[in-house]
Amino acid sequence: MKTYSQLKDTAQTRKDKKMTENAKKMLAEIQYPALQGTQDEVELAEKIRKAFIDYYMKKIDSHKAESYVDDQKKYASRCKKEARDVAEMKATIENFDEAALWIRYTGKQCFVERYSWDTVAQKEIDWKFFDLGDHIADYVQDGMSKEKVKKELRAIGML
């Protein structure tokens, strides 16, 4: 016969699993706008998108193992926040497709070429690349020309 503590642990495990599944489902349902560009550009943008989603999926899984997420409410809100972060990222970088194409344009495919997606999803993330994407997205929203963007990126040491 199981003790109260064992039964409680079993119930907790079921709740953890369900919440992780729900968070992943939310991630999977995020709708992205259709991509435009050459086939190479579209493939690159898709790879970048996939890397973001894979990274967040892994991040959700890893939270279960982290000791500071003992409180179930914190864990639940954390999972929801991760899914929300991806949705917000998609919203703030509506121009991320364009940013990805510009990364290709400026020859900054090193991220795609140097890192396997498994490595990216685990921990070896090239944050400089993500910063570059953010900077480009900001510049695109400000309506800068490609030449001006390249000049700005060189000035801050991104190119």
Question: Which residues does each predicted region cover?
Answer:
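Charged, low-complexity intrinsically disordered segments and flexible loops
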Residues: 1-159
